[in-house]
Each structure stands twice: as structure tokens, then as C-alpha cells.
């Protein structure tokens, strides 16, 4: 059976990727900082789907932990067929108001860790084939502080890597959701209903993951789940940035 390694797997989109992949029969390696939620999810998936689930506790803001995850990806004896780079977090304040160390950690998790794990994944997969999904954001198409900058990098690098390594059997897809019902905003201190986001703009995590997996299977370099956000991205290319920046003001759109 194929094996998928998912970072940020304890909740939100990461957990939903795990559920949908397990339902398809994939064995899993679940990565997140804490093991309690991972162990609960792992038990659920083993029971419901009969798949093998490995739990790997790692803080992707720490270089040593990123190295451990990269080594697991590189393990030829237990190959990874699909890497889902999903780990990430938002910061509650504007750039100048955040502690600079928080901003640096934010950059490490979103960009450096994703790059290191992609490097390990591509090296392990090229020739035999494999797939990488980078969970980016619609915010990557809209100028807004470091969150958008990180996601923009991830989108651009995914596009290049997909074109470069598809000839070696490795596809790379940036999945770019808009506002999605997960615990992301709550971890930023925004309680449900107080995110400042109109109801019609919210997406369901299951729909985001379903469309992302479908687009990745088709070899697309960028996946933008839902028609409404496809329209927003199209408009962002032609409208002044001052009009589109507000769409991303809460971080993960």
C-alpha cells in the first residue's frame, strides 16, 4: 500500500488529509508537535480503515526535528509515496508588532521546513515516482505581511518543482484554500464568529482536501479549491493590491 507522510496532522486540514487518505487505503506517518492528539487520530484510523499508522512527534521550528522527519522521508526501506507539507500557524499582530523571534520561527516552519522536506522527498521519489502536496493559501496571491509572503514562495516554488521534476515521476502541487473551518483562527485567539469573515467565504475542510487530492492526482501545480476563490485569485491579478489585500487581513485565506 502507498504511504503518506503528513505534517501538522493533529488537527484541521492535516487531520482531514489523514482521514481521506486512510479511507483510500494509504498507510500513514503523522507528524505534529504533540503526540496526544496524534495517538487519538492514529487509533481512529487504524480501527476504521485497517491501515498502518506511525506517529512521529516533531517541532518543525527546530532544525533537529526537521532533520528527523527528513530522514524518515529518505528511508528507502520504508518509502514515502506522498508528502503533505501542511504544518503552519498564523501570527495575531501586524509585522512590526510581532516579536521578531516569532516571525523568524514562522518563516522556518512555513518555508525552511517545507523546503527541507521537499528536498528529501524529491531525492527519495525521483525515478520511482511520488507526489508532494504543499498546503499554501489564497493569501499567497495577495500582498499581506509575512504570512502571504511565505505562501507566495511556496506557490512559486511548487510551480517550478512540478515542471522540473515531473519528468522524473514526481509531481508537486500547492493547494491554496481560502478561509476554512479549522482550529487555525482559534489558535490565533479569534473565537468562532469573531474572525471578521462573511459566512459565504468559509470553506469546509473535507471539500478543500478532496479537491486538493484530485488536482494533485491530475498533476496540477496549483489547486485553488472552490469557484469563489478561483474568482478572487483571478481578480487579484488585475485589481489594485489595495483592494485585494483586505481579503487576507486575518492571515490564512
Predicted feature locations:
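Active-site helix of classical SDR
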Residues: 118, 150-153
Amino acid at each position: 500500500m502507498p504511504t503518506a507522510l503528513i505534517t501538522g496532522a493533529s488537527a484541521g486540514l492535516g487531520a482531514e488529509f489523514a482521514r481521506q487518505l486512510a479511507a483510500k487505503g494509504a498507510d500513514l506517518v503523522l507528524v505534529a508537535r504533540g503526540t496526544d492528539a496524534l495517538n487519538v487520530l492514529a487509533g481512529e484510523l487504524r480501527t476504521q480503515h485497517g491501515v498502518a499508522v506511525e506517529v512521529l512527534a516533531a517541532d518543525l521550528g527546530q532544525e533537529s526535528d526537521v532533520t528527523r522527519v527528513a530522514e524518515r522521508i529518505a528511508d528507502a526501506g520504508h518509502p514515502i509515496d506522498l508528502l503533505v507539507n501542511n504544518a503552519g500557524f498564523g501570527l495575531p499582530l501586524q509585522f512590526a508588532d510581532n516579536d521578531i523571534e516569532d516571525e523568524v520561527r514562522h518563516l522556518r516552519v512555513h518555508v525552511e521546513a517545507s523546503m527541507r522536506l521537499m528536498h528529501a522527498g524529491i531525492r527519495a521519489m525521483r525515478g520511482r515516482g511520488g507526489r508532494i502536496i504543499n498546503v499554501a493559501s489564497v493569501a499567497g496571491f495577495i500582498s499581506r505581511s509575512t504570512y502571504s509572503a511565505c505562501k507566495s514562495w511556496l506557490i512559486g516554488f511548487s510551480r517550478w518543482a512540478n515542471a522540473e521534476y515531473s519528468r522524473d515521476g514526481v509531481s508537486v502541487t500547492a493547494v491554496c484554500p481560502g478561509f476554512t473551518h479549522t482550529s487555525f483562527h482559534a489558535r490565533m485567539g479569534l473565537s468562532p464568529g469573531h474572525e471578521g469573515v462573511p459566512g459565504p467565504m468559509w470553506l469546509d475542510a473535507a471539500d478543500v482536501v478532496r479537491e486538493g487530492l484530485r488536482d494533485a492526482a491530475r498533476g496540477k501545480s496549483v489547486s485553488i479549491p472552490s469557484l469563489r476563490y478561483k474568482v478572487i485569485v483571478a481578480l487579484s491579478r488585475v485589481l489594485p493590491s489595495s483592494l485585494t489585500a483586505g481579503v487576507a487581513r486575518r492571515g490564512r485565506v
